[in-house]
């Protein structure tokens, strides 16, 4: 089932939907059962809450924009892109793609996908097996469960596999 969390009050527009477990609206977000994010306000999920530029940190994750707290697993920096195993990155015009089962992504800047994790952003640099982020373009985030879903002005991320897409991402940290 899809859990829709609309953030139209923040001036965000069209919604993007993923099959089965995840749905997204970029830049606004409708979240799957696991994780949802929205900007610029903050709503806290059972484990984590985020604020930009300030941070409220849960036991596992903290985010800040433009400042970044990096976890031991994954970090990103703009504008170069380096891909870790099972991860692919691409920035440029690609509006929609499907990666892992039951996951669909749509964002202004997405180009290619890897088996388990895929990233796409105008500014992405480094990745590790786990995932974490924080970026100037990431106003607000809410993390909820084992799966993860993100959306900044143009960022979307999904559960069974990981997927990112945003026009401006500086760094991320999640563990």
From Swiss-Prot:
Sequence repeats: 17-20, 25-28, 31-34, 38-41, 44-47, 51-54, 57-60, 64-67, 70-73, 77-80, 83-86, 91-94, 99-102, 106-109, 134-137, 144-147, 151-154, 158-161, 165-168
Any GO molecular function: structural constituent of cuticle
Top-level division of the source organism's lineage: Eukaryota
Key word Repeat present: yes
Keywords: Cuticle, Repeat
Keyword field contains Protease: no
Annotated function: Component of the cuticle of migratory locust which contains more than 100 different structural proteins.
Domain remarks in the Swiss-Prot or TrEMBL record: The tetrapeptide (A-A-P-[AV]) repeats found throughout the protein are also present in many proteins constituting the protective envelope of other species.
Name of the protein described by the UniProt record: Cuticle protein 16.5, isoform B
Originating organism: Locusta migratoria
Lineage: Eukaryota, Metazoa, Ecdysozoa, Arthropoda, Hexapoda
């Amino acid at each position: 089932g899809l859990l829709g969390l609309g953030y139209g009050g923040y001036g965000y527009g069209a919604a993007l939907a993923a099959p089965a477990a995840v749905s997204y609206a970029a830049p606004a977000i409708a979240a799957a059962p696991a994780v949802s994010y929205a900007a610029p306000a903050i709503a806290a999920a059972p484990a984590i809450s985020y604020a930009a530029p300030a941070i409220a940190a849960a036991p596992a994750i903290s985010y800040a924009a433009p400042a970044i707290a990096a976890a031991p697993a994954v970090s990103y920096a703009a504008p170069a892109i380096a891909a870790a195993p099972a991860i692919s990155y691409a920035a440029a015009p690609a509006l929609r793609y499907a990666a892992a089962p039951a996951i669909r992504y749509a964002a202004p800047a997405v180009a290619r996908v890897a088996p388990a994790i895929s990233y796409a952003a105008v500014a992405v640099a480094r990745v590790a097996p786990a995932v974490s982020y924080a970026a100037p373009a990431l106003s607000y985030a809410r993390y909820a469960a084992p799966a993860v879903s993100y959306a900044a002005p143009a960022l979307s991320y999904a559960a069974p596999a990981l997927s990112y897409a945003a026009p401006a991402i500086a760094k991320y940290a999640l563990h």
